[in-house]
């Protein structure tokens, strides 16, 4: 979910990470069912025909998905990410303002255009134990209220709201 949502080079670019392997999902096929992977030369050389690991797929290189993916990737210019960041900051600011005004015990987690609202006494949710303490009933009520107002949020605070 982080392939191209936050930067042209994904979270790898954002956090300056150079992984051994990278996987990409639907975006690489313009939303069509396809995936891709890549990695360091010494790992990728293990794949056939150079290496002993055979890899194949029914839809590998599907022309429709590749064409759609190329079209989307060509559209993802830097200004798209700047605009998404501006909109995301506006939503985060509004949520925070509402949290303060209503004295709600909640926390917003956001990276680029991905965000979620946690109902919790904690200022940050960092691990599984923190997540176990989330007020899921409160989120369910909030979700229903927002839906009634025409705002579509993820049905669980364990899911992420995507603007991208």
Residue ranges and their predicted role:
Residues 1-164:
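Conserved N-terminal phosphate-binding loop of PLP-dependent enzymes in the Aspartate aminotransferase
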């Amino acid at each position: 979910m982080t392939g191209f949502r936050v930067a042209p080079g994904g979270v790898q670019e954002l956090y300056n990470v150079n992984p051994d392997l990278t996987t990409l999902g639907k975006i690489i096929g313009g939303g069509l069912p396809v995936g891709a992977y890549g990695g360091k030369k010494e790992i990728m050389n293990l794949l056939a025909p150079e290496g002993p690991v055979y890899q194949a797929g029914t839809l590998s290189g599907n022309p429709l998905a590749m064409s759609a993916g190329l079209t989307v990737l060509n559209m993802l210019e830097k200004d798209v990410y700047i605009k998404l960041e501006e909109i995301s900051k506006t939503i985060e600011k509004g949520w925070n303002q509402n949290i303060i005004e209503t004295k709600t015990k909640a926390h917003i987690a956001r990276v680029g255009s991905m965000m979620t609202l946690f109902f919790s006494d904690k200022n940050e949710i960092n691990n599984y134990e923190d997540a176990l303490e989330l007020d899921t009933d409160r989120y369910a009520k909030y979700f229903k209220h927002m839906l009634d107002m025409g705002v579509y949020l993820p049905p669980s605070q364990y899911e992420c709201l995507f603007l991208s």
